[in-house]
Curated annotation (Swiss-Prot):
EC number: 3.6.1.7
Gene3D superfamilies on file: 3.30.70.100
Taxonomic path: Bacteria, Bacillati, Chloroflexota, Dehalococcoidia, Dehalococcoidales
One Pfam family linked to the record: Acylphosphatase
Protein's name according to its UniProt entry: Acylphosphatase
Family: Belongs to the acylphosphatase family.
Amino acid sequence: MHCLRAIVKGKVQGVYFRDFTRTQATRLGLCGYAKNLANGAEVEVVAEGDKDALLEFLDLLRSGPPRAEVKDVETSWETATANYSDFRIKH
């Protein structure tokens, strides 16, 4: 199992980005969370699962849902913790 941490930047709040993220993560069998950051222009995403699924997920994060305007995605690969049983939206 692998862990992807991403900070998605741009017009990603108020455009259903976190819901899109949860839908895609669930479809790919990933666990973790998506959370709006306080600056109003970034979403933090942590996802754990199969490497191929995470790479597909990363491509989806780079495009986002129709109303989003993704400007950049900062990524890091970390050690998976297996602390997640599903994919959630954090507030």
